[in-house]
Amino acid sequence: MQAPPPEHCPGVESEEAGKGSACSGCPNQGLCSDPNKKLEDPGKALVVESMKDVKHKLLILSGKGGVGKSTVTSLLTRYLARSNPDSNFGVLDIDICGPSQPRLMGALGESVHQSGYGWSPVGIEDNVCLMSIGFLLGSVDDAIIWRGPKKNGMIRQFLSEVDWGNLDLLLLDTPPGTSDEHLSVVSYLKDDANPESLRAVMVTTPQEVSLLDVRKEINFCKKQNIPIVGVIENMSSFRCGHCGNSSEIFPAKTGGAAAMCAEMGIPLLGSLPLDQQISKACDSGEDLTEFKNVTTEALEGICSKIMASFS
């Protein structure tokens, strides 16, 4: 018989399954450590039940840090919510050690409340809610120094103990790389019976140092059988606020995202500029999408392609 997982269970897919300190005393320890008797993670059933009313999940990924995944996640969410007022959207910040969404979404200082159905995510707009470990810290400057099993346990809690309600789309802001957080969230959310319910969008900048890592992330998705909606090239150009001329801050020496997408057979969803208004909005938590500008023009095309992929 399977017992409930311990608080910091590393998960059955982890190399630490049945071996970690959290496994000591767990009735499932022998089963998890035996490769011939692997069980499905007992926490997955809880996740499936909690997420049953979430229609679609979208991972925002990039192998490279600093390319703007969190910024792109917040911009996509804001624009999708504004252009689809009858749909409900959620954001889950699984960048455990570097949560940015509370600031980007203008929710710094908000707290999470407990209800009979679990944690209640923070409401951003009438049709947008957000959950982040940033809401659970005593100070925005507190450092989170956790090993993989504890981070995985936190992600499982976010997926199984948050009352997400009815969502048309949940966007997941991820950390760089293909680490424990990625493996954990994929193992919980991937549904073999409905593989199209979990998809991914890649974020890159034009230079090859970013594209190298994005290629690895694309291959990660292919190995995990996660459909890729497409690639967003962020910071593709800079438009001067005085003269209006555009210039390339990060030159695409190898052809940028367009060349990589053609090479790997992945759709290019569009490009976002390096925009001073984005920087100001990120720091203040304001909604940039309510104004007509070069960024919202680009977001219109990108978001329409994302929504079309789920229809």
Curated annotation (Swiss-Prot):
It holds the Pfam family ParA. One of its GO terms (biological process) is iron-sulfur cluster assembly. [4Fe-4S] cluster 1 binds at C9, C23, C26, C32. InterPro entries: Mrp/NBP35_ATP-bd, NUBP1/Nbp35, P-loop_NTPase, YlxH/NBP35. Keywords: 4Fe-4S, ATP-binding, Cytoplasm, Iron, Iron-sulfur, Metal-binding, Nucleotide-binding. [4Fe-4S] cluster 2 binds at C240, C243. The keyword Plastid does not apply. ATP binds at G63, K64, G65, G66, V67, G68, K69, S70. Component of the cytosolic iron-sulfur (Fe/S) protein assembly (CIA) machinery. Required for maturation of extramitochondrial Fe-S proteins. The Nubp1-Nubp2 heterotetramer forms a Fe-S scaffold complex, mediating the de novo assembly of an Fe-S cluster and its transfer to target apoproteins. GO terms for molecular function: 4 iron, 4 sulfur cluster binding; ATP binding; ATP hydrolysis activity; ATP-dependent FeS chaperone activity; iron-sulfur cluster binding; metal ion binding. It is found in: Cytoplasm. SUPFAM superfamilies: P-loop containing nucleoside triphosphate hydrolases (SSF52540). The keyword Ion transport does not apply. Binds 4 [4Fe-4S] clusters per heterotetramer. Contains two stable clusters in the N-termini of Nubp1 and two labile, bridging clusters between subunits of the Nubp1-Nubp2 heterotetramer. Residues 1-21 are annotated as: Disordered. The gene is Nubp1. It comes from Drosophila melanogaster. This is Cytosolic Fe-S cluster assembly factor Nubp1 homolog. Belongs to the Mrp/NBP35 ATP-binding proteins family. NUBP1/NBP35 subfamily. Its cofactor is [4Fe-4S] cluster.
